[in-house]
Design a protein with these regions (language model features):
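Alpha-helical transmembrane spans
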Residues: 9-73
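Phosphoinositide-binding peripheral membrane targeting modules
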Residues: 109-143, 149-153
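Short, flexible helical or helix-coil boundary motifs
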Residues: 27, 81-91, 179, 198, ...
Length: 210
């Protein structure tokens, strides 16, 4: 069974990085601005101030680069799942976690949705749902919890951006009142089948759930 909860050694660097962005970065940038403003005629002092500002901005630049990298990885996985016959959500029904480590795409026309999470390096969750193989969806603040029917992953969580959580719940509730036909294929099985191929192609571990 894959371990989703991050260990203490994994959490500590993330916490320190978050604190640096929230608390350390503004202070460093402020010091740099003061250094430039106090002696703007002194080229050396000005360059030093600019360097300090860049150092202060670097955590945000790194966070942006990591988010872009995560989104790029997820998009590669999605390219193997999306098709006009099985799963093709409209852009407004594709939701990303704030740091792009998780994705939820909802195909309202076909009654399917896909959850992807980059758990850690080399480990990815890729799960397909129709309107029958999940228990419920709840919103706790901005944390969306999908309750599944699998013992290995009873709850799948995803942070949401402002307003997205309510939109997801509203959309799913609307879809629950529709009558979808799944005569041609079993969508969760389709995703699980593709997950094996994706795991081999991208050299990642994707757990398969029954």
């Amino acid at each position: 069974m894959i371990k989703r909860k991050r260990s203490v050694p994994e959490v500590i660097p993330m916490t320190l990085f978050y604190m640096l962005r929230v608390f350390g970065s503004p202070i460093i940038i402020f010091i740099g601005i003061i250094a430039v403003w106090i002696d703007s005629r002194n080229t050396t002092e000005t360059m030093m101030g600019i360097a300090i500002i860049i150092i202060g901005l670097s955590p945000h630049i790194l966070a942006y680069a990591l988010a872009r990298s995560s989104r790029k990885k997820i998009r590669k996985i999605l390219s193997a799942i999306k098709s006009s016959e099985s799963f093709l959500p409209e852009p407004q029904y594709e939701f990303w976690e704030p740091h792009s480590e998780a994705y939820l795409g909802i195909d309202a026309k076909r009654g399917n949705f896909v959850y992807i999470r980059l758990i850690r390096r080399g480990q990815v969750d890729l799960i397909g749902f129709d309107m029958h193989n999940w228990v419920g969806i709840e919103l706790d603040g901005r944390l969306l919890n999908i309750k599944t029917k699998t013992i290995e992953a009873p709850v799948l969580s995803m942070g949401t951006r402002a307003g997205d959580g309510d939109r997801i719940l509203s959309l799913i509730n609307t879809m629950s009142n529709r009558q979808y036909r799944y005569d041609c294929y079993y969508f969760p099985g389709y995703v699980a089948h593709n997950a094996k191929r994706i795991a081999e192609e991208y050299k990642v571990f994707i757990p398969v759930y029954n």
